[in-house]
């Protein structure tokens, strides 16, 4: 079993849930009502007193201040997501939970949602937790990653950790990988090395392919393969999850 704690306490504690805003993948909207009316209805449910100014502020913040009486069923996917974000912000949350906020959006819509999310953190101090499989988009805004498999957090990484894991590297395939690794570590102490399950060696840190190959040849170690590679975020996570399944 496990335990969930939010703000240092149980999420069931009185008042805790009011500090959390939530946007599910497809926000629940009343299609025959305007954005403003949807917001006012949510404000009423939250018990907010005289929420008109707050509603207008949030609609302006999310770029919906000029949509007027247009019914939300006529909104684009991006507009619906922005309204869902505004609804989630009505209670002035300290923590915002977003489930696939970029799913189904065109590049312009995704960029706009991403900009809003980053503004919420930078300008309003709101912590944003995003559940998503759109790794390319996450890589443009995340500062910390948590990898969940079968309900368990299997690894946490900072953005710096991920950048390092996804940095350029040389892939070295040698006849004697154990000896090759020892030779390279001694010759290039400032580089980082990783032994792979397929017996290849990855060399990180702006390694010179010619120097690496020459060093191994000088020691009589046959080089069977040597090439530069760039691992993107998706490849890194797929490899990591594969390792977790094997491990």
PLM feature spans:
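Hydrophobic side chains in well-ordered alpha-helices
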Residues: 16, 180-184, 212
